[in-house]
From Swiss-Prot:
Testis-specific. Expressed in spermatocytes and round and elongated spermatids in the seminiferous tubules. InterPro entries: SPATA16 (IPR029161), TPR-like_helical_dom_sf (IPR011990). This is Spermatogenesis-associated protein 16. It comes from the Eukaryota. It comes from Mus musculus. GO terms for cellular component: acrosomal vesicle; Golgi apparatus. Residues 30-42 have a biased composition (Polar residues). Belongs to the SPATA16 family.
Amino acid sequence: MDSGKSRSLETTVKRVYRDLLLPKINTSKKMSTLTNSPSSLEGTPGIKKNSGEMQAEASAERVKLTKSIKEKQNNELEKVALKRKADSEEKLVGKKEAKIMELDNQLVTTVPLPHIPLKNIMDVEMKLVYVDEEDVSYEFAQPNMCLGLQATGQTATTMPPASPRDLTTLPQIDKWLQVALKDASSCYRQKKYAVAAGQFRTALELCSKGAALGKPFEAHAEDIASIASFIETKLVTCYLRMRKPDLALNHAHRSIVLNPAYFRNHLRQAAVFRCLERYSEAARSAMIADYMFWLCGGSEHSVSKLIKLYWQAMIEEAITRAEAFSVMYTPFATRIKPENIEKVKEVFMRTHPTYVDCIYTDTQGLHVLPQTADWSCFPPQQYLLTLGFKNKEDGKFLEKVSSRKLPTYTEHKTPFSPLTREDTVRHMETVGKRILPILDFIRSTQLNGNFHACSGVMEKLHYASLLSRLQRVKEQAQVINQAMAELATVPYLQDISQQEAELLQSLMADAMDTLEGKKSDKERVWNTIQKVGRIEDFLYQLEDSFLKTKKLRTARRQKTKMKRLQTVQQN
């Protein structure tokens, strides 16, 4: 696909995106599941809307309807759970106590990562990524229905209704769009992937111009998003079949922006990252896919098992390929004490003697591994992550992660002056090659942590700004698309405060404007935050300098005083 047509496609489909972004944020965690407690699926606080009273009313109805479904399902859950708990409590209590004692008294620091053959990874992709889904109805909101796993491995997910409407029938797709999709699917099954990709791009243009549903003026944004997301995923599979993962990447990101709740969208993104050898990001996408499958009520253990296998393989590959650092996971069952962290570091130093210049133990958030991840048990088995570096400079920035809310990682000695081109190139190299790979690895086993809700995304947006300064437009667009996909997913992974929700909305809006090439008198949110971080760093440096100077001055005074006393005594 040439660059002109690609830009045209991006422009035409953005109208669909803009209608969807704010409602998606406002209805965070809108799915319900029979294995969740009522408190864990409470919706996040509302976000201020710019689209008028009608949208606000629709959002309120959405929340009420979702809440009623959750309450009904969770009442049924409590009855079943009490019976199960009574039956299994006696059997489990002995084992659980023994496990906790073992983890408290003995630090079990070796978690085996057996090698997973490439054939097994490809089998997972064939069953879950390259599924030929002709029907887009699986992405429409459907109440209390979960289709079983079919012979092809296709499964449907359920979501509570996103808007107050009659759900007895699914929306009718526009007939011309339906014809285009059937023709494209036919070419795909005939292995004419290039032709199929062209027809799916045509279908995407039809969809973005309003030809998505039979009654366009009565269409809901969620329904249009479902169809657009489906087409984006088909483009992903076409480009993967053509062995062009670089072309598939942006489509994978957009499918998540349009429908972050569908687990296959995340798994397809993981497959693209794998083909690009970005294994840490592939591992995180697979982890989110497994969580979304469970969150949406997926009950097929065979599907979850395949996703976890894929997730495990990506972590293994990321660890194997890491050269700058080594890693150790330590299981724990109770609150970690400072003396336990010191013991972990001692064990790490004995186990990895060449990676001891800088040792960082992440105490900020929960880490999970695919071998023991069970989302229905909250919290699942937790792990401490310890990273060791050959070069102290590579891991130095991690100290800021644990001590500051929104740290900046670029050493900008003059925070009130603009960056020169040389500084920009140097910072881009630092962020792109040293900081982001480590943060991506940390997040490959961390669904959510005690960091800020947008942690991990902010760094990518800062990186996009550096790319923009160097006029690397294509790379900038990819990074922003990826950041938008992560922002769209955040409300499903953790509860966010009102302040965080407003920040999320501002980041998403600015990211969209940047992609569209819109200029604004105001600075982008992430650049403003970066400036605040630089000023904070500058103040910290001034404070450190002042305290050091004060300490030296005090020491000199004491020394002078001692000399005077000695002189007096001698005289």
